[in-house]
Every structure is written in C-alpha cells, then in structure tokens.
Amino acid sequence: MGEALRGLKRTIMCGESRENNIGQKVTVMGWVQRKRNLGGLIFVDLRDRTGIMQIVFGEEINKEAFEKSDNVKSEYCIAVTGEIVKRQSPNNDMETGAVELKGEDIKILSESETPPIYIKEGLDASENIRLKYRYLDLRRPDMQKIFMIRHKTCKVVRDFLDENGFLEMETPILTKSTPEGARDYLVPSRNYKGMFYALPQSPQIFKQLLMVSGYDKYFQITKCFRDEDLRANRQPEFTQIDMELSFVEEDDVIELNERLLAKVFKEVGGIDVKLPIERMPYKIAMEKYGSDKPDLRFGMEINDLTEAVKNSEFKVFKGAIEAGGSVRAIKAENCATMGRKQIDKLQDFVKTYKAKGLAWIAYKEDEIKSPIAKFLTEEEMKAILEKMDAKAGDLILIVADKNNVVFESLGALRLHIAKELDIINKNEFRFVWITEFPLLAYNEEEGRYQAEHHPFTAIMDEDIELLGTEPGKVRAKAYDIVLNGEELGGGSIRIHDSKFQEKMFSVLGFTKEKAWERFGFLLEAFKFGPPPHGGLAYGLDRMIMFLAGTENIKDVITFPKNQNAFCPLTEAPNVVDENQLEELGIKKIEKED
C-alpha cells in the first residue's frame, strides 16, 4: 500500500524548474521515467504532464531518502522534496537540463507493475495494445502535448466567441430520431416501452430553435454520434464546435469564422492564416481538382480537352462526348520516363473509381510516345499539348467518361501521384472556402432527391424558381472550409419560412404527413417569427489533428473506439443482463445460421 500525502503539497511541476529556481526548496510529484544507480548516487527522472526533472539522491544528501529511492521502479508514483541546484553537467536536450533536485525526502505514493507498453515519445506498439492500456498510452509526453493543444484550442475558441457576443448553450443528447443520411444510435425508453430516443448526429434543429427563441448567437463544443461504417479517421462519437447566428448572410458567417480560424491557428499552432481566405464555387473545384475538398498545396489541375478533341474519330473520346460526358486530363511534370508497369498501376487505380481506362501521352525530348497517337490527327495531338501547356518530360493522363466519373477518378489520381512524387509541402496550410454547393443529389436507387447537406439549407436567391422545375440545378447557400484537402467544417444559411420548409420536404419526397410527423415541432416554431439565421460547425477532432501534426484521429480523442467501433479498454459494446432488457421491453432474437 502506498504512502499517504498527509498534507504534503506539490509546489512546482516537473517541467517548470529553471535556473531562476536555484536555491528554492520544492516538492514535486509524478511518475518515475527511469532510474540510474551509480553506487553512491541514484538518479531518478521524474515525469509529469509538463516535462521531466532529474532528481539526485545520495547518502550525503539524505541517507534515508537515498536508501528508499533504491526501491523505486519505472512508473512508480512518488513525491520528492528537496532543493533545486545547478547541474554540474547540463543536459541541453532537456528544458529543465540546467538544474536538478537534491532529494531530501521521498514518499512512494503507489507502486507499478511492469507496464505492457514503454512510456516514451514515438511509441512503436500495436493500436490494439495502445487502446487496451489507453491510460498508460496517455501518459506518454507526445500524447499529453496533444491534449494540452486540444485544451488550448477549446479555450481560444470559447474566449473568441465570448468576446464576439456568443452564448454557450447546451442542447439535448436524448432526442428524436429523424433518419436521413447516417444511421442514428438508438436508446430504448423504459417509461415508453417500444419507443426510442436517438443520440444526436448534430445539434442542427435545436440550434435553429434557439434562434427562433431569440438567443441570437449560440455556440457549444459538443459530442455528436453517427452509427456509420467506419472509414479511416472516422469515429462513432466525435466532437463539434457548433455555432448559429441570427440576422446574418453568408458573408457574415464566413468573415467571423475567418477571424476565428486565424486566431486559433496563430495562438495554438503559431501558424499564420492569410485573410481573406480564398473562395471557390463547387463547380470550379470539381472541374479543376475533381473534388469538393481540393488540396491546393500543389498544382496538377484538371484540364478540359473536350473542345480540342470534339471532332476526333477516336472511339473512346467520341463515345464519351456523344453521351454527354467529357475528355479531361492532368499533367504530371517530369514523369514522361515512367515505365509501363507504373502506368498500368495508374490504369488499375482509376478503374477503382469506375473509369473505363486511362489514356496517356509521354512528351519526351525526341519523341511523343502514346498508345492513342495512332487514333489522333496531328492537329488533335498539337491541340492537346497546347491545352495542357506540355513541355518535354511531361506525362499527360487522360480520362474520357461521364463527368462525375472523370472528376472523381482524375481528382483521386491527382492526389495519388502527388503523394507518390512527394511534391506536397507538408509544412504549408492552404485554406479554401467551397461555396455554391448543389442543394440536392438524385438517389437513383430510391428514385428521389436527397439533401446534399441537410434539408434545412437555404437556396441561392437566383435559383429559387428552379426548385419546382429543375431541382438538380439548384445551388445552396452552403459553405465548407477546407484545409489541405480535408473538410474542417461546414455550414449554411437556413430556411426560416414554414411553408418553404414544407416545400423543401416535398421536393425530397416527404408527404406532408411524414414531414409533420418527423419535423412538425420545427415547422410549428417557424410560424412564430423566426429570424433569418445561419451557422457552421467544425470537427474539433480534425482541427486538433492539424494543430498537433498527427494523421490518426484516435491520437486526439482520449478514449477512442477502434476501426470496428469497439473499445478494447472497456470492451464496449457488451452484453447486458436479461432483466435490464426485460425492464425495457426488449427481447433478443438469436441470429439463425
């Protein structure tokens, strides 16, 4: 059993001691990083979340403390009292390396078994072991730095929004299921057997109701839940920085959030954000980068060759154009010497994005090499090279197909090649607003339109009349903030008219009865003078990944789930007692083989 503190107080953190503390008598508490016994002296590196302090025990300093210190092992939790002195041999690799603590008294607060993972920076252990022993993984200095960054980010956000007149308000966690998009996590009700709450995918509807309530500027940093198939860097529960404002238009929300981003990235990460941030309509983003999340840290933009080859007899080009598609290409500079095997791999790569194939032209010093050259006239080849601004050494990669296939395949290929060539500047932070999103996307399987963002998004004023005739052409008052090819956040101006919201539900295939059954409380609220309003939400976890310099979302969440939405630490989800299920009116059905 460990020793009690008995009134002993920590007076300094391990990572805080400097030369100006020399001569002070202090008490430090933390975990033993390592111990070195040099015979007459014992050195202990003591660690807490601020850093490491070297402690020296010796018979001449204090015999009892010296003998007791010989019993400590790695990860023992101890308290040491003594005097800070100048080190005879400073360690310039440590922030506290100019000083050390002469250990005059030691308390062993608790012992530790040999840890299953080595607690150090740059740990090389399996993800499952790290998550199973997460409380040990979180002791590592690089993990503790991440969560100090997370804390500071939340503080800067709160301070900024408070200074700009926002109120931090909470919205319900147990709410109504309104299935549209990702699956809800459902919570059975004991009082209303056979009925369920849902955990919120976002506070969307409630924050709009707060605007109807007159709170004007709302924010919260809140948990959200989505029961979806997990992809890389997705978690079933995640954290949003959520906000909503009344009496605003798009420019107001964007300008405020540019100032917020500049403040957060400067104060937390030391990163300068150039304002104003570039804005790019969705249509341009897709045509130039094949993505609504373009990475602008490198070029290799998509070029439209349709006009250059519109009269071509090459069946692949001709067929795509006649079917209403297009012929587009990217240029990989200095890649004309790429071998056939490498190009074949690129062929296979674009086929995973439903492209039928990949045509290529290698512009070499002494020749133009291409398997499609024989199908093109000299004028067509010249027009392609001019359109691509090609020079000797360049490789042109062409896809001809339906526009959505062309954009998606070339957009993915652009990123793939940039990573392979290592031409992306990892120290650059390129923000861009993507605007004028399509309001709706047609679901061919269900035979109806679906909201591209959510069904509460307002329409561009000039597109309102298209809603009843050509809904696929309607643009939304929506905006996403993208950083280095990743969506950092997104938002929109909202519909604030009950009748127009009903019309939107109708376009989405809802009957009036179904719309009122699911969203009647919102439609009813909109009858009582709702203000124009809009907002935005950031993925806090994604933001911390950028600020902390990690590519793994699990690194920025204290107790994350694994790729199967399972917690190796607590073994959740787990089987519950039959009496709990009976109380909820739930009966398990055994799965048949």
Swiss-Prot record:
Gene3D superfamilies, per database record: Bira Bifunctional Protein, Domain 2, GAD-like domain, Nucleic acid-binding proteins
Q: Where in the cell is it found?
A: Cytoplasm
CDD domains reported for this sequence = AspRS_core, EcAspRS_like_N
Q: Could you tell me which Pfam families the record lists for this protein?
A: GAD, tRNA-synt_2, tRNA_anti-codon
Record region (Aspartate): 204-207
What's a single GO MF annotation on this record?
transferase activity
Q: Which reaction does it catalyse?
A: tRNA(Asp) + L-aspartate + ATP = L-aspartyl-tRNA(Asp) + AMP + diphosphate
Q: Name one GO cellular component term.
A: cytoplasm
According to its UniProt record, the EC number is: 6.1.1.12
Q: Looking at the keywords, is Iron-sulfur present?
A: no
Q: What does this protein do?
A: Catalyzes the attachment of L-aspartate to tRNA(Asp) in a two-step reaction: L-aspartate is first activated by ATP to form Asp-AMP and then transferred to the acceptor end of tRNA(Asp).
Enumerate the PANTHER family for this protein.
ASPARTATE--TRNA LIGASE, MITOCHONDRIAL, ASPARTYL/LYSYL-TRNA SYNTHETASE
Q: Which family does it belong to?
A: Belongs to the class-II aminoacyl-tRNA synthetase family. Type 1 subfamily.
Q: What is this protein called?
A: Aspartate--tRNA ligase
Per the UniProt record, the source organism is: Clostridium botulinum (strain Hall / ATCC 3502 / NCTC 13319 / Type A)
The beginning of the lineage is: Bacteria, Bacillati, Bacillota, Clostridia, Eubacteriales
The UniProt gene name for this protein comes to aspS
